[in-house]
């Protein structure tokens, strides 16, 4: 079977789709991924064949962008044209399309290719704030977001169902929650001061450097060790220094997370649920009020597995929040419950079964 995965350089949307694509390939199927040129290395590192959009506008999510600048990228008609041309030349048996790429979704529907929408965050956000905001903007480009989603053969929602408020409402017949698709290892926390991982967005959200600086200043006053990763969006040497804080551009989160006791992050779905999969409670400081980050943070806080704060929070407020989450075992207990659920869900396998079942 020939399966096409259609994605974009949006940060946390990429890893779960690539995990599913790799699993489909491991099952013996032919897989191709098409996306922005900036994703080439990431896709090839996953062992997958990659094709860059030939005519889509240039896009690099690590650069600083205003919220409005994402709208033309989401609705880039050239993405639709590139996907349509690829489908005509190398007809896939199945296509899996990022939920935010409406031009690509329209293209595979026009080509009558069996397809799945890949929803990489909580549907509570996608069918609420995102549909009303980005969906309204998409109408100006001629795309009806609900119509395109509902017309798909399948809509895979890659998050923990019980933490997604939308799961308690009636849904279109094509919607399937599979669980969070994130890598996880059983935690192994060594004796000594707790290790804290700080990972804000790899996207260029404005104001992130100031938030990170306050986080470093807060960590410097506490009896712990911390690793701060900036992900290319912020230069490490622009942040304060402290004896107990190591600042890196990049680090292997998979190697760090089993040893960490807390994640301080922006609330991006992928990194947040990856931390929870390692039984880590989270302190979420959203980088953007228009993204899913605030709702992700609220859902985790409601489950007792973390705390969420505004990005203007003071150094002292951040310090108190870090101390509270590390000091009260209830946060770790709730995170561990979610972690066991994620590790036991086999979400990636469920997604593969649904995708390969379309033909």
Segments from the language model and where they lie:
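Nucleotide-sugar-dependent glycosyltransferase catalytic domains
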Residues: 29-225, 232, 239-240
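Short, solvent-exposed coil/turn linker segments
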Residues: 185, 235, 308-311
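A fold-wide structural signal in alpha/beta-hydrolase
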Residues: 225-227, 281
């Amino acid at each position: 079977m020939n399966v096409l995965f259609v994605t974009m350089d949006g940060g946390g949307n990429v890893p779960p789709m690539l995990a599913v694509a790799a699993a489909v390939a491991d099952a013996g199927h032919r897989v191709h991924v098409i996306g922005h040129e900036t994703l080439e290395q990431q896709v090839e590192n996953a062992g997958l064949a990659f094709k860059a959009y030939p005519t889509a506008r240039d896009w690099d999510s690590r650069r600083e962008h205003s919220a409005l600048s994402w709208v033309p990228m989401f609705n880039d008609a050239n993405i639709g044209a590139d996907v349509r041309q690829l489908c005509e030349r190398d007809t896939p048996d199945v296509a899996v399309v990022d939920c935010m790429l409406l031009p690509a979704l329209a293209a595979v529907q026009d080509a009558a290719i069996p397809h799945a929408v890949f929803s990489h965050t909580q549907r509570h956000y996608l069918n609420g704030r995102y549909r009303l905001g980005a969906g309204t903007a998409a109408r100006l480009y001629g795309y009806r977001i609900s119509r395109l989603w509902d017309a798909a053969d399948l809509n895979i929602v890659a998050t923990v169902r019980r933490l997604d408020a939308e799961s308690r409402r009636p849904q279109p017949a094509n919607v399937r929650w599979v669980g969070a698709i994130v890598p996880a290892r059983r935690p192994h926390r060594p004796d000594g001061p707790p290790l804290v991982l700080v990972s804000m967005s790899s996207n260029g959200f404005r104001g992130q450097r100031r938030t990170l600086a306050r986080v470093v200043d807060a960590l410097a006053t506490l009896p712990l060790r911390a690793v701060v990763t900036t992900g290319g969006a912020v230069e490490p040497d622009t942040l304060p220094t402290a004896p107990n804080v190591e600042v890196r551009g990049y680090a292997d989160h998979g190697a760090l997370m089993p040893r960490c006791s807390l994640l301080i992050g922006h609330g991006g779905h992928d990194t947040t649920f990856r931390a929870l999969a390692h039984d880590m409670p989270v302190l979420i400081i959203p980088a953007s009020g228009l993204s899913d980050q605030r709702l992700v943070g609220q859902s985790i806080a409601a489950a007792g597995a973390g705390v969420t704060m505004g990005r203007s929070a003071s150094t002292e407020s951040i310090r108190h929040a870090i101390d509270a989450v590390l000091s009260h075992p209830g946060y770790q207990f709730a995170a561990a419950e979610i972690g066991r659920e994620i590790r036991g869900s086999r979400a990636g396998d469920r997604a593969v079964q649904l995708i390969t079942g379309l033909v």
